[in-house]
A protein has these predicted regions:
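Glycine-centered hinge/linker elements that transmit conformational signals in sensory
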Residues: 7-9, 19-49, 93
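Extracytoplasmic/secreted proteins, especially bacterial periplasmic and envelope-associated proteins
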Residues: 4, 30-37, 50, 59, ...
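Extracytoplasmic/periplasmic solute-binding protein
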Residues: 1-24, 60-62
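Alpha-to-beta junction loops
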Residues: 57-69
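C-terminal capping/gating helix-and-loop segments adjacent to ligand/active sites or protein-protein/ligand interfaces
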Residues: 165-212
Length: 212
């Protein structure tokens, strides 16, 4: 449920567009492989519209989750309330025949204005926010995001923090999380990316509706 063509494309070692958005990779064999895979996957549902409720009832074998969603619903009591009828855990995204177990990752960027009169102070502040382990550890305490520091992501204190309210044996594997971050794909966000993606998405939806 909720597995998209874009996720399949990334996991097959390719992106829909080049870095500047001046050309697409639609004619690449890896792109067509990805679309065919998603189409065959959807055909197994035999026109049944799978919903999030099917997952909640334990009728779905696999569903992509964001890290923030995982953190929201794994701890007690939310997990017991929403997913009490079955056990579930996290694994890496499936790999395409020409790719790897990769998934899209959103990154929060920090920047400094070229017009600032306090360049050194601004640069020191950015470095402090991004390299200080105590500050980076607060990300796990106060948000549903992940740190940019491997030392924080793989630390025992972080693992204990994430798993303290998780019932049973369903713990978050920090080495898995670190690997997912290392192999994550940050999309090329060129100027007209949203428009290009929406047009592509509509075309692909039409392609998937055409019978063989």
């Amino acid at each position: 449920y909720d597995y998209t063509w874009l996720q399949a494309v990334y996991s097959n070692g390719i992106s829909p567009f080049n870095k500047k958005g001046t050309s697409s990779n639609f004619l690449d064999e890896r792109f067509s492989q990805s679309l065919e895979f998603v189409k065959r996957l959807e055909e197994t549902n035999r026109n049944y519209q799978v919903t999030s409720n099917d997952f909640d009832l334990g009728k779905v074998a696999f569903r992509p989750f964001t890290f923030s969603d995982y953190r929201t619903y794994m701890p007690y009591p939310w997990r017991i309330k929403k997913y009490s009828s079955f056990e579930w855990t996290c694994i890496r995204m499936p790999a395409g025949p020409s790719g790897d177990n990769r998934s899209e990752m959103s990154a929060l960027m920090a920047g400094m204005s070229s017009r600032t009169g306090k360049k050194q102070a601004a640069w020191d502040f950015i470095k402090m926010l991004t390299t200080d382990e105590d500050i980076q550890r607060l990300i796990y305490e106060d948000t549903s995001a992940a740190s940019v520091l491997k030392s924080v992501n793989t630390s025992k204190s972080t693992m204990n923090l994430l798993n303290k309210d998780t019932p049973g044996d369903s713990i978050i594997d920090m080495s898995l999380l670190d690997t997912v971050i290392d192999t994550g794909v940050i999309p090329y966000r060129f100027k007209d990316y949203t428009e290009a993606y929406e047009k592509t998405d509509n075309l692909i939806k039409g392609y998937r509706m055409v019978p063989n």
